[in-house]
Amino acid sequence: IDRDQLNEAFWLGVGSPGSVAPAPGTIYSPGAEWNKKWGVLDLKQANDLLDKVGLSKKDSDGYRLRADGKGRLRLEMVTVGGQFVPYTQIGEMVKQQWKKIGIDVDIKELERNLAFTRDNNNENQLITWANDGSEVLFLFPRHALPVDAAESHMGMAYARWYASRGASGKKPDDAEMLRAFDLFRE
């Protein structure tokens, strides 16, 4: 994602493009390098990562093909209309940016309650939402780690597993996520 382009277009250049990490200057900041990690546009790295996970084949329009051979890889990005941030327009710009790496995106604007109900039912592939509050990780952890079974916008099955201490949901198979869960619980 070209966060600088988004910043210029939607925040008139006054934002601070970066990653989901507590802001520098807060006691929770893991260090300035984390505010840019995975948040800087690098088309070569993006293409290399997509190729590495088995998405190296493309159709005649340059879009990546699914690894299972069932045609073009197409993602649905849910946006919430009528909010304080123009999520749908941001989604459209990201769609154009991802075209450069061969990712096809359908933008689907939904009413907020429906979008969040779909989130809770683990029915969204992607959803756009604000990242406000991530500078205080313990107040708004859901922006960085799926620990809130009611309001995480990512990994709801993982959030349910974490919140229920393994009684429901799905245990992540990623060791780093499990370690992050352990550290957060401490």
Task: Enumerate the language-model features and the residues they cover.
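Alpha-to-beta junction loops
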Residues: M93-Q97, I103-D104, N121-W129
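Ligand-binding clamshell of periplasmic/extracellular solute-binding protein-like
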Residues: I127-P141
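Short helix/loop segment immediately N-terminal to the Walker
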Residues: S56-R74
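Extracytoplasmic/peripheral linker and loop segments enriched in polar/acidic and small residues
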Residues: N7-E8, L12, G18-V20, G39, ...
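Short, well-ordered beta-strand elements
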Residues: R72-G82, V105-D106
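Structural transition elements
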Residues: D2, P17-S60, G81-Q89
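Short, flexible loop/turn elements at secondary-structure junctions
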Residues: I1, V14, T26, T79-Q83, ...
